């Protein structure tokens, strides 16, 4: 594997959306520090990692109340003490709820408000910079959910509103109630279905794009070796793309990317991340990591330059026909943007 391109470039700033929010051109996804990707990591190490990121210029920090649940927000709350809060753009999310042991989605006004209050308390802040609806509640008209978020903006509890895993039509309806600043979606070399409808809609409306899992949930760092190293507590073990029947074919994609990275003098993960950075000045990827060396490597991806021909070559490695398996297990796939239409506003009876 090639040596990493050095993290020499300063992390530039970018406007996210058209409502006034400015962030670092690369953010830090914090989920894996506390949840879903194996056991929680040691808290002092993660606080040190967050402080290292901020010092390096990666200031958009991304969390959610469901990570843990709650423990990731508490971790960030500790990391933000001592004047760090003023140096970062803090993004968190609401909407995924575990009730009676079952995973559900809620966007009713009372829940939205209670979730926001809970996040403010855990994070130890008086305002959240960017507050996303993590998943769309298909029982509640999107206008109702955004209406409550609009009130939270007016009260100063949140500054900007975001959506995650929302369809183009849902984004349009939401944006008509209150301007949406950012849409978070999975976008990487092997997850490109958002390009058809959602990305153009965001661009038409002046909405920023935040790309989660830009490294294919770590796949573009190590290929099939990653899957072999996963702990039993790692939810990636259940992702169809990582199942044995799909892995062999998907591993070929990684090997091609790896070979091109060697030619470019960077790592495969830097190459995959650079591809996302090259999608436009309105795109902010938020790779997650738990290691300072990987964070430095991710920052180094900002200095990897790709020609249009190289972009096309990379894309040819991971065409829709080449990628095997869905990006989520079936139980979680029913809350992605493909299943995010909400009832008409006229159907809503306030409870």
UniProtKB/Swiss-Prot annotation:
Active site: 67
Positions of NADP(+) binding: 213-223
Stretches with biased composition (Polar residues): 332-351
E.C. numbers: 1.1.1.-
Keyword NADP annotated: yes
Binding site for substrate: 134
GO molecular function: aldo-keto reductase (NADPH) activity
Record-level GO cellular component terms: cytoplasm
Keyword set, alphabetical order: NADP, Oxidoreductase
Claim: Nucleotidyltransferase is one of the keywords in the record: no
Leading EC class: oxidoreductase
The protein's name: Probable aldo-keto reductase 2
Source organism (scientific name): Oryza sativa subsp. indica (Rice)
């Amino acid at each position: 594997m090639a040596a990493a391109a050095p993290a020499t470039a300063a992390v530039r700033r970018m406007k996210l959306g058209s409502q006034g929010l400015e962030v670092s051109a690369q953010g830090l996804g914090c989920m894996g520090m506390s949840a879903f990707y194996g056991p929680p990591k040691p808290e002092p190490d993660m606080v040190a990692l967050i402080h290292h990121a901020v010092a390096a210029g990666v200031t958009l920090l991304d969390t959610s109340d469901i990570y843990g649940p709650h423990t990731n927000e508490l971790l960030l709350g500790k990391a933000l003490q001592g004047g760090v809060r003023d140096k970062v753009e803090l993004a968190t999310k609401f909407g995924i709820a575990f009730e009676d042991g079952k995973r559900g989605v809620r966007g009713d006004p009372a829940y939205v408000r209670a979730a926001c209050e809970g996040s403010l308390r855990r994070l130890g802040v008086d305002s959240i910079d960017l507050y996303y609806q993590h998943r769309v509640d298909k029982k509640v008209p999107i206008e109702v959910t955004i209406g409550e978020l609009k009130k939270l903006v007016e009260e100063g509890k949140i500054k900007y509103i975001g959506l995650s895993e929302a369809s183009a039509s849902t984004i349009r309806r939401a944006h008509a109630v209150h301007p949406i600043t950012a849409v978070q979606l999975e976008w990487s070399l092997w997850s490109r279905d958002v390009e058809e409808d959602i990305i153009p809609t965001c661009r038409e409306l002046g909405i920023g794009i935040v790309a989660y899992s830009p490294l294919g949930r770590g796949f573009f760092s190590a290929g099939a070796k990653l899957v072999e190293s996963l702990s039993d507590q790692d939810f990636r073990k259940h992702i169809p793309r990582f199942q044995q029947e799909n892995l062999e074919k998907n591993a070929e994609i990684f090997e091609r990317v790896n070979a091109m990275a060697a030619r470019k003098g960077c790592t495969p993960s830097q190459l995959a991340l650079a591809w996302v950075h090259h999608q436009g000045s309105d795109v902010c990827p938020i790779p997650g990591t738990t290691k300072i060396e990987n964070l430095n490597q991710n920052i180094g991806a900002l200095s990897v330059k790709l020609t249009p021909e190289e972009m096309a070559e990379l894309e040819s490695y991971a065409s829709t026909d080449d990628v095997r398996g869905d990006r989520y297990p079936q139980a979680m796939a029913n809350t992605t943007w493909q299943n995010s239409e909400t009832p008409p506003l006229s159907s809503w009876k306030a409870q």
